[in-house]
From Swiss-Prot:
Localization per record: Membrane
Domain of life per record: Eukaryota
Record protein name field: Delta 8-(E)-sphingolipid desaturase
Enzyme's top EC category: oxidoreductase
Enzyme Commission code: 1.14.19.18
Predominant subcellular localization, coarse grouping: membrane
Binding positions for heme per the UniProt entry: 35, 58
Family, similarity comment: Belongs to the fatty acid desaturase type 1 family.
Gene Ontology BP, a term: sphingolipid metabolic process
GO molecular function, one term: oxidoreductase activity, acting on paired donors, with oxidation of a pair of donors resulting in the reduction of molecular oxygen to two molecules of water
Lineage: Eukaryota, Fungi, Dikarya, Ascomycota, Saccharomycotina
Pathway(s): Lipid metabolism; sphingolipid metabolism
Domain (Cytochrome b5 heme-binding): residue spans on this chain: 1-75
Amino acid sequence: MVVSREEVREIIGRGNAIVIYEDHLLNLNGWLERHPGGEKAIHHMIGRDASDEMNAYHDPETVKTFKRWSIGRVKLPWDNLVPPIQGGNYSFDKVDQRVIYKKLGIFPGVKIEPKVQENIVLTEKSASKLLPVGGVRDPKTIIEDFDNKLVYEDIKQIPSLDHETQRNLSLQYNELHQTIINRGYYQCDYWQYFKEFCRISSLFLLFVLFLRSKWYTLSAISIGLMWQQLVFIAHDAGHISITHNYQIDNIIGIIIANFIGGLSLGWWKRNHNVHHLVTNDPVHDPDIQHLPFFAVSSRLLGNVFSTYYEKYLWFDKIAQKMLQIQHKLYYPILSFGRFNLYRLSWSHLIMGLGPRKGKAAWFRYLELIGLCFFSYWFFYKTMSYIPTKTLRFWFLLISHWTTMIVHVQIVLSHFAMSTSDLGSTESFVSRQLRTTMDVDCPEWFDFFHGGLQFQAIHHLFPRLPRHNFRKVQPLVIEFCKNTGLHYSIYGFVDGNGKVVNKMADVASQVVILNDCLHSIHLENTTGKNLYEAKVESVSIKG
């Protein structure tokens, strides 16, 4: 049975989680609670052709099971609907609000507005009409004004967003993916993990040796570096890219993340899966939602409702003060990042936000045991070995400050990149390359970055073992040359410079917005509103 686009809209409107895979209409109502990747990952794909995403994130055996959820066929090519969680327009008059929230991710009393409405294809010409810039006096429009300029710049730098061009990009991406599979790049090089084991074991031995020798600063640095390196293996395990066995890789990840590192692998996976699907979207991607401390998009300056955290991110007085100097506070705040991860990890497990049913459900209890074990061996046993409260305090700070390195590495790949919503026509491959950068470094130094230097490649092929990223890089570069997509790569210093500059740009918008709010009624000697005059003097940095 072939189902039309409007019929699909009606089926979703009856409270069904409908996703398009190839030419099949999948009803995932019965899978939401069991999906190991979390229900929100599915919510963001409702009404869309998710073929590229589903093939990229799942192993071949899992891919074979997709069509068992099929309830019909659709005619290809499919024009994406906007998912309900992203503000799609559906009629839910006869559906219970609890069903809508559970199955579709819609929040009662909250209205999400997509930047680009359904059936709109952004072009340079249409963007100037749909996303006007300039001549504003209302302080609320400063957010849209700044963001619209960035959207316009993005449109000029990528291939056309029309359906045919984006479908061709998808086809070429799938050809590239098949080439990578055929060349055996999904085979994990376990010799590289033996090297990782030796390196991390050495850091652990140094931690113990220095601790017993009462060289507490060196001991703290050693364990901090060990945690930094362990994060990369936990990341690999979370993507099932070590053994490609779901249970084994998750157990490896939990031992490393929870038992040794004190962080929840389940929390990270739930967060990270959404991040991969809606990368750098200010409303939906939790990886760039850090108010009141950071904002990398002016869209976060307007009390945005986070569909991930299910709450408003308030642009309150604290945020208004902090964001004006965020580029100056960037590194100091990142140095305390691990403490926030402890909070998020415990909250995730205590509140039971991970899968409650299916093969991933039991991980919650193993993770809780892991966090308790970590608290015992680090916060109790290790700290009790240090004689004074002052030394314990500094040991705690130095060990956690050392892990700031990995926080810088994580955000480097995305903070400086596009945060624009270009509409539902943009393909998976276009979005990933537009919102992600790689970091240039010599091959011998790859271990230090742990694969995070190839985040653009990782976002295209999430299950690919990281030790093969460098082998795949020439293929991705050639692909980008052939398609007109841009492969962004910068040195570590230059990349950090772009991040800080991006944050300074947004900080300048906060200053302007605050000036507007305080002086909207005052006029300067030219008769212009002070806010309007200042807007004219500010230009967006490239």
